[in-house]
A protein has these predicted regions:
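PRPP-associated nucleotide enzymes
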Residues: 11, 19-199
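Ser/Thr-rich, low-complexity intrinsically disordered segments
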Residues: 1-8
Length: 199
């Protein structure tokens, strides 16, 4: 009986360990960790794709994800920039399940109104597609510039498999839905005190 219990306990312990190991492995597999070098390379590929296929008159970035992308693209393509700020009503990230997004009242930009003729709307990724779809709707109804808009095209660095939105320009189309860990994301877990200590 003791031997039977020992074997049974060992079997249970093994199953617990195996499940734990599987969960860790799956968690790691579900992440796409992107280095600074990889990130810059993807942005450069996006710039080439845009240069070959479209002549926008202004770049509009969705904050915060598009901030570094639009900075680089504006320097390469020599175009004016604008920003729109969005958050979900529940404050838990941009794309909640109900699709409730809250837009800032104004676009932040030094671009002239007439520059909004051919817009390239930029985000870091197409996750569900909700943010890009809603942003297009919002831009079309934005009073100061809507009469100048003739065309809106979209660009992002990654498109996830389950996204319902197909961006016009996108260098990386994924065959899964990983959590994309971008180069600056670790700063969200660091306090200013920790940064001071290591500097």
């Amino acid at each position: 009986i003791k031997i039977h219990k020992t074997i049974k306990n060992f079997h249970n312990d093994f199953l617990i360990f195996f499940n734990f190991f599987y969960m860790i492995k799956k968690s790691m597999a579900d992440k796409l960790i992107v280095s600074f070098e990889e990130y810059i390379k993807i942005v450069e590929k996006l710039a080439i794709e845009i240069h070959k296929n479209y002549k926008p008159t202004v770049l509009v970035g969705i904050m915060r994800g598009a901030a570094p992308i639009i900075d680089i693209l504006s320097r390469i393509l020599k175009l004016p920039i604008a920003y729109i700020v969005i958050q979900s009503y529940i404050g838990k990230g941009l794309e909640d399940q109900q699709g409730q997004l809250m837009f800032a009242r104004e676009i932040s930009s030094l671009a002239k109104e007439k520059d909004f003729e051919k817009i390239l709307l930029i985000d870091d990724l197409s996750d569900t597609g909700l943010t890009l779809n809603k942003s297009i709707e919002w831009l079309k109804g934005y009073e100061p510039t809507k009469r100048f808009i003739k065309e809106i095209k979209t660009a992002c660095l990654w498109k996830k498999k389950s996204s319902s939105f197909e961006p016009d320009f996108c260098p990386i189309k994924l065959d899964s839905d990983p959590w994309i860990v971008q180069p600056t994301e670790h700063y969200e877990e660091l306090s200013i005190e920790e940064i001071i200590k290591r500097n």
